[in-house]
Design a protein with these regions (language model features):
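Short, hydrophobic alpha-helical segments
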Residues: 169, 212-220
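N-terminal beta-loop-helix "entrance" segment that forms/cooperates
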Residues: 35-59, 148-153
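Glycine-rich, highly charged phosphate/nucleotide-binding loops
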Residues: 47-68, 156-165
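Periplasmic-binding protein-like
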Residues: 6-7, 67-77, 173-184
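Short hydrophobic segments within beta-strands
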Residues: 7-9, 36, 114, 182
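Active-site rim beta-loop-alpha module in soluble metabolic enzymes
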Residues: 117-173, 177-183
């Protein structure tokens, strides 16, 4: 069985555990999924500086990851920190939850991202452009309130994300085929919202498992 490492670029071990459980469910026993929490950094990436710092931390882990001989690696924060560095430094396929979810969403048509971190909206928009998906990208919709405070309250997080999802659907006037819940710490809330949102909801962690599975399969010909 192929061994996949999901790396949480922030320092919150509870977030890592939640994402690992969701990833293993998505893998359905076809991949062996393990997880690692960043050894330093911030508990939640909320701005470009924290995203850059997370990239530096993950880049520093490349020698360790190379020695562990993973079959695939996932960078599991929505800004995909260190994605290119990991691809260049490792001898295995690498994806990120941002890239994987956007590419999956684009397969259905126009999409938007719903998230809690206003300071990362520019990075998310840039990612859509870098992936060549600008024509399908419907923008970033934000939850009300402080990102950390909202994320730390599971019930409030679901409520605010649902509100933002419904606002996105309304403002798009039926023009969106899907919405992405953008953020590793939002993974559990995304599971809840699948049944509540009137368009297809893309969960980044399961999307990354599907993508890395295909990448590993292709790499092994």
């Amino acid at each position: 069985m192929k061994r996949i490492l999901l790396v949480n670029p922030n320092t919150n071990a509870a977030t890592t555990a939640s994402m690992l459980a969701i990833a293993r469910e998505a893998a359905a026993g076809l991949l062996q999924i393990e997880a690692m929490t960043a050894p330093e950094g911030v508990p939640m990436i909320t701005d470009p500086l924290a995203l850059q710092q997370a990239s530096q931390v993950l880049t520093g882990l490349i020698p360790e990851l190379r020695a562990q001989n993973w079959d695939g690696v996932i960078t599991a924060a929505y800004g995909d920190p260190a994605l290119q560095a990991l691809r260049e430094g490792l001898d295995c396929p690498v994806t990120g939850i941002g890239e994987a979810s956007m590419l999956e969403a684009a397969g259905y048509g126009a999409f938007a991202v719903v998230t809690t971190t206003p300071e990362l909206a520019g990075s998310i928009t840039a990612m859509a452009g870098w992936l060549g998906l600008g024509a399908l990208f419907g923008g970033v919709y934000l939850t009300r309130g402080d990102a950390v405070a909202v994320t730390d309250d599971p019930a409030l997080l679901v409520e605010r994300l649902e509100e933002a999802c419904l606002r996105a659907v309304h403002e798009a006037g039926g023009g969106l085929a899907s919405l992405i819940i953008g953020g590793g710490p939002l993974a559990v809330a995304a599971r809840v919202l699948v049944e509540r949102v009137p368009v297809r909801l893309i969960e980044p962690v399961p999307a990354s498992i599907r993508r890395i599975g295909l990448m590993v399969q292709r790499a092994n010909g």
